[in-house]
Amino acid sequence: MKFIISRFLTKGVLVLVGMLAGSPLVFGDTIAIIGTGNVGGALGPQFATLGHNIIYGSREPDREDVQALVAQTGHNATAMLPVQAAAAADIVVMATKWAQAEVALKSLGDLAGKIVLDPNNAVHVDSSGKRHHAVATSAGQMIQDWVPNAMVVKAFNTLGAGTMANPESAGGPVTIPIAGNDPDAKAVIASLVTGIGFEVVDMGDISVSQVLEKMLVERGNANITFNYYFRPVPQ
C-alpha cells in the first residue's frame, strides 16, 4: 500500500475526506474495471472524470459494445484482456457478476499490493422473486480470501448502477458505506466515492461486508426503490 500511496503523491494532488481524517487520500493513477456491464459501465466513466486512467478488462476487448464504452468514457480510456488490465493497474474493480467473480479474479494473476474494489453482492433470487443472502460469510470476505495479499474494499454494493452513473438522479445525498481491513486502501476508495458525488462512511473491517450485502437484499425486497443516507452519531 505504501508503494501505491507514494506513486499517487508524486502527482502532487492531495484530497481530504472528513470521515477519514488523518489518512492519506489522493486521486490519480490507473484503475482496471474488470467487466463492462452495468456496474463497470457506470463506474468507469465516473472515475475517468477524476483524472484516473481507466482500462476496461474484457475477454473481447475489441467487441463493439466494449469499444463504445471506451469511447463514452473518453479521457484516453482503453480496453484489453482482464489479466493485462489488472497488471497495469493500482486499483482493480471487480465489476463482474457474482457467479463469475471467483474464476475472473483468479485469472488476473498476482494482485499483491493492489487495491481490489468489490461492489458485489452474494445474492440468490428465489422463484417468487425474493432476494436472499446466498453465502455463509460475504462476497467481500470470500474475495479477500481468494486474494490474501491484495487489499479488498467493499463499496458501491448498496445502490443501483443508474445512481452510480448519475448521482444527481437520486434527488439528494446518498451514503456509500465501505468496509475493508487496510485503512490506507479504504482512504483511497473513499476519495473515489466522494469525488464522484457521494458521501462515505467507514463501517469497519471486511467482515462488515455481511451487513452491507444484506442492506442490498433489503433494498431489493422493498416495495419501493430507495437509496441509503445516514451519518454516524456524534460522539
Regions found by a protein language model. Give the residues of each.
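Bacterial N-terminal signal peptides
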Residues: 11-23
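Rossmann-fold NAD(P)-binding glycine/threonine-rich loop
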Residues: 120-153, 158-162, 167
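Active-site-lining helix/loop region of Rossmann-like oxidoreductase modules
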Residues: 174-235
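Redox-cofactor binding/interface segments in oxidoreductases and associated redox assembly factors
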Residues: 93-95, 117-118, 154
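NAD(P)+-binding Rossmann beta1-loop-alpha1 motif at the extreme N-terminus of oxidoreductases
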Residues: 24-68
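Bacterial N-terminal signal peptides that target proteins for export
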Residues: 2-13
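Short, conserved loop/helix-junction motifs that constitute active-site signature segments
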Residues: 107-113, 147, 170
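Conserved N-terminal Rossmann-fold NAD(P) cofactor-binding segment
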Residues: 49-91, 95-103, 107-110
